């Protein structure tokens, strides 16, 4: 990541009374502004929000969630579009996830796979899709209550093992605004605080997902190296089923290393702080 620029905290998946959320657009925006967020995208189902800026300076990216399929047998795909300059040419009768991705991109936005663990998406099916900008590795509203599958790390690893390394994003997917708001965010490293710079950084993959801690992952001389805010545990994930250096535990950890095995093709990292909050890097190709 670039050294210059600014770090900006954002949420790019949330709902209001315009679809299945329980608060108004105005209240949803206010909740995140009070929580200190720098940017958000309101992503109601099949209702595109507009780009803007609040009086307090929080950036509003345009957004929408396009969902298809009701059962795993049919295939459940929820795809979030962010930053579209025009309305994607899509109807609610659409059945193709690939066409949704294509139309989001054609409208100037980025397409994000939402909560793949919740949707029980298979890595093999998603590997056939093209044009995704990233996937949610953690989705707050998919946690208890009312759901039970918030974490998609296994999916990310299975997909990366097939050679598809999707950047990892964090999102609240807020509906109730009780337990599911301002929990898991995306931290974007942008050249400045502007709509254009945020979208540029997202497209470049200059971000990580977090509930609070910071994380940076590099590969140096046969090792994966993490730099982070003070942590209780650092975990390394890859396509090796066994690596005896993949976990570092202690107090106030700010750096950790994992020896890479000759056959590993990717690595990613997670940081856990003393409160149990996590930060998630994206997977990095090592060969």
Regions picked out by a protein language model, each given a short descriptive name:
Residues 1-7, 163-167, 174-287:
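C-terminal functional module detector
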